[in-house]
């Protein structure tokens, strides 16, 4: 037990040092008891919330999320979804197909409900103001900087018919309860102030802390979710220690007791027909002088063989075990003792230590969210591309490893981005996730353009340096809510380059990359190749020349704004490094001592990592068997 806790102690120590360095973040301890009525689909709960105001600010009010209230006719989520259904995007409408106009048609016993009946701070009742999915609490006494208070809440709710993420009784998966966003959750407060974001079905941002949750439900239900089950021997259902007797209490209901350290949310799901499988991956590994302790790890799977075959579900555990060494080598150690893949009413959708899956296909994407949503916990509303995009990047890379596929792993993401850039619908990645004009633009930006950011960073810095940046990012920013500036500054330190220009162009604008071969000619003993920048986003450029004898040369032109040169990536091909290309200049000329007549191919960006929106002008094949040489003007 001491070994298993050593990583958490290390994490908390790092968090304290983080606070002492001048930065700060709020902290919470939740203790919740909830009682579910499976006949009425209603629940009641009590919450004790210890809240640390580690900020230098005096807080005169606080805010809580009440997500279930979005699933009511006329809600902001309902109105927005129906509005998007009037917008033509390509050949269809801009619906979220899972939501569409379903909320407006919910009956009274199908809607969602979340009500805080009373709330006390340090034993005193507080004034409550409801704003649909946000509860504003006007405090009778301000919370002083660097102080702690205790909130006590009584709440009740109704589980909505499954629409999006949370809910019950999906007719396809036939899962009874997918309980995400189910409790009053305090909003995050950071250096930008409060984040009381009304829920319209998009992203999340939570406070780091510990969750102690007891769920009372009919004794034939099986539960999985966030955290470590504390009373496995009283519950059973495959959680008990092998060979030991299960001692279930008498009565119609069981209490499931979970504890989740150092997380920012808590999800659970329940169904009487779940099949539970588990796979123990490793025992705990003690800390050494050069590395922290690594906790033991067990993977769990809860599924119903309804909308997919059992064998497809059960492959998840073996595939995850096979992927884990590669994942931890490139993206950092998984820091918790368990992870649960859960067949849910919607998904995939990620939560700390767990995921909801509508089918087995999305398991890898959702698991990698444990890093970019679970461990880093960036503000997803402001930096969705740092969560969805980096998760997609990791998924693509790991999938290639699992499939032993040597082709370019990120082609789908690059195509998704290029289609967005050419659609006329693109908005900057800095757009708040809730406020993109179209769902289509949001999805392509967050997933595709975000993934391209990371692979293209490797084009700029060199892939090996980018890989070290990923590990540096994990080591420095896990459990700390990093921003885009935090990532860029860290990447600059590792690469020795200036990279703020990359963020300004790629994240803050919609300017595009387009380079072309302009012309070729001989000048004495040299062959000259002029490259032209057509797009408005400048980049360093790799130009590869192939000659009639099969030999190749790589000509590397750094960008002036980067103030550095990437390392050689392929020692088998000679590389020539040029003086930087000034971003103000539209053309640049490279040279080779080989005769023009020996050049058979000029190729801008042979690695395909440059997100060039028109690759047709990136290559020039020369056929010297024709009477007149081919030249581009």
List each model region and its residues.
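Hydrophobic alpha-helical and helix-loop surface patches within well-folded domains
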Residues: 19, 27-28, 66, 258, ...
């Amino acid at each position: 037990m001491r070994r298993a806790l050593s990583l958490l102690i290390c994490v908390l120590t790092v968090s304290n040092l983080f606070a002492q360095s001048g930065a700060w973040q709020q902290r919470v301890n939740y203790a919740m008891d909830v009682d579910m009525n499976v006949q009425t689909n209603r629940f009641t709960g009590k919450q004790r919330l210890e809240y640390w105001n580690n900020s230098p600010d005096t807080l005169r009010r606080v805010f809580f999320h009440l997500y279930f209230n979005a699933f009511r006719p006329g809600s902001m989520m309902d109105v927005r979804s129906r509005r998007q259904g009037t917008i033509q995007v390509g050949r269809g409408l801009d619906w979220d197909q899972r939501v569409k106009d379903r909320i407006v048609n919910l009956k009274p016993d199908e809607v969602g409900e979340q009500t805080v009946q009373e709330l006390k701070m340090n034993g005193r009742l507080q004034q409550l103001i409801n704003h649909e999915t946000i509860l504003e609490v006007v405090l009778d006494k301000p919370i002083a900087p660097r102080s702690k208070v205790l909130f006590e809440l009584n709440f009740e709710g109704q589980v909505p018919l499954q629409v999006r993420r949370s809910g019950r009784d999906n007719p396809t998966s036939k899962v009874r309860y997918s309980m995400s966003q189910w409790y009053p959750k305090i909003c995050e407060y950071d250096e930008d102030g409060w984040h009381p974001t009304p829920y319209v079905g998009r992203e999340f941002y939570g406070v780091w802390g510990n969750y102690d949750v007891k769920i009372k439900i009919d004794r034939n239900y099986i539960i999985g979710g966030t955290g470590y089950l504390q009373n496995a021997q009283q519950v059973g259902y495959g959680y008990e220690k092998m060979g030991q007797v299960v001692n279930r209490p008498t009565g119609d209901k069981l209490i499931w007791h979970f504890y989740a350290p150092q997380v920012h949310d808590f999800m659970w799901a329940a169904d009487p027909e779940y099949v539970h499988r588990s796979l123990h991956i490793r025992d705990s590994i003690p800390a050494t002088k050069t590395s922290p302790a690594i906790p033991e790890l067990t993977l769990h799977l809860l599924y119903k063989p309804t909308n997919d075959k059992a064998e497809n579900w059960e492959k998840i555990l073996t595939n995850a075990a096979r992927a884990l060494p590669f994942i931890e080598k490139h993206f950092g150690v998984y820091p918790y003792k368990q992870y649960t893949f859960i067949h849910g009413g919607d998904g995939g959708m990620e939560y700390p230590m767990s995921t909801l899956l509508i089918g087995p296909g999305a398991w890898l994407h959702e698991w990698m969210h444990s890093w970019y949503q679970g461990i880093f916990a960036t503000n997803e509303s402001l930096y969705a591309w740092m969560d969805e995009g980096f998760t997609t990047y990791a998924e693509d890379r790991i999938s290639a490893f699992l499939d032993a596929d040597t082709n370019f792993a990120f082609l789908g993401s690059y195509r998704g981005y290029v289609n967005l850039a050419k659609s006329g619908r693109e908005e900057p990645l800095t757009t708040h996730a809730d406020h993109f004009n179209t769902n289509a633009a949001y999805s392509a930006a967050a997933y595709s353009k975000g993934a391209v950011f990371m692979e293209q960073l490797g084009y700029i810095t060199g892939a090996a340096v980018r890989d070290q940046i990923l590990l540096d990012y994990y080591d420095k920013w896990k459990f700390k809510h990093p921003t885009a500036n935090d990532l860029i500054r860290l990447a600059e330190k590792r690469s020795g380059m200036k990279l703020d220009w990359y963020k300004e162009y790629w994240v803050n604008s919609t300017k595009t990359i387009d380079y072309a071969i302009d012309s070729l000619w001989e000048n004495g003993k040299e062959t000259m190749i002029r490259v032209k920048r057509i797009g408005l986003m400048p980049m360093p450029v790799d130009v590869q020349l192939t000659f009639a004898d099969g030999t190749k040369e790589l000509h590397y032109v750094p960008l002036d704004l980067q103030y550095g040169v990437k390392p050689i990536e392929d020692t088998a091909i000679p590389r020539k490094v040029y003086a930087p290309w000034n971003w103000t200049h539209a053309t640049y000329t490279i040279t080779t001592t080989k005769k023009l007549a020996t050049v058979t191919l000029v190729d801008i960006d042979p690695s395909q990592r440059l997100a060039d929106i028109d690759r047709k002008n990136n290559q020039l094949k020369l056929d010297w068997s024709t009477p007149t040489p081919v030249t581009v003007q």
